[in-house]
Amino acid sequence: MQNIKEYVEAKKLALKEQLNGNNNLKAVIVQVGDVEASNRYVRNKIKDLEEVGIRIGLVKCPETISEDALLDRLRKLNIDQSVTGYLVQLPLPKHISEERVNSVIYPWKDIDGFNALSKTVPATPLGVYTYLKDMNYEFSGKNAVIIGRSNIVGRPMHKLLLDANMNVTVLHTKTSEEDKKFYLEHADLIVVAAGKAGVLNKSYKLKETAVVMDVGINFNEEGKLIGDCEKDLPVAFQSPVPGGCGLLTRLAVIENLVALANDNN
């Protein structure tokens, strides 16, 4: 497996050359509130998009904005012909429904792919899948285990891997420990997106040939970013955190925007 940072940089360079500065693409990021973690993610996304020559707009809303007021802003972006696509930075304040927000975003402007009618695939599973595909990973007939069943990662990841002819099992909070051990022991590919540090650790017997993609984002007591997996698992490849699936997600955001532009043309 190629180093993920090197892979992402090479793909971004190729996208920049493809766009060649001669494009009218514009992405807008809508951010509610001023949480430092979200600020960091937004800064990174802006940096990525600017590096490949895409114009950026940032709409910052106060944390106290009402749901209706936010939805009105999104509806304006839906009809703004200068905007190729946009995304709403998550998480949102508790008084705002992510489901309602996702349903308002027009499918042909949905960079994140969270609207049920969107052609785009949510960025994290798309990024993971595309990386594995570009690494010539042999999906067909192999056993995949996904830990987590969110609409953002687990469920769309399940569809991608199933469509690639893998035998896919989804583990979640109601899966017994006995079943978890069994499926993990036989897994060729493990995608971990549980949102809990240490969910996959060295207490489990894993195949030495297994590939582990750690999508988790957690912070330890020292405030350092860590994944859902214990480090240095005895497998063939384990994506790092940081510097792994987060980079793949950000790359997929760019690729989704380009795909939207191509579809809309």
Language model feature labels by segment:
Residues 90, 193-194, 215-216:
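Glycine-rich, N-terminal phosphate-binding loop of Rossmann-like dinucleotide-binding domains
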Residues 18, 85-139, 180, 198-199:
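Anion-binding alpha/beta catalytic cores of soluble intermediary-metabolism enzymes, centered on
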Residues 1-23:
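Positively charged, low-complexity intrinsically disordered leader regions
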Residues 49-63, 168-171:
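Short beta-strand elements in bilobed, periplasmic/extracellular small-molecule ligand-binding domains
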Residues 69-81:
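Short, well-structured alpha-helical segments in soluble
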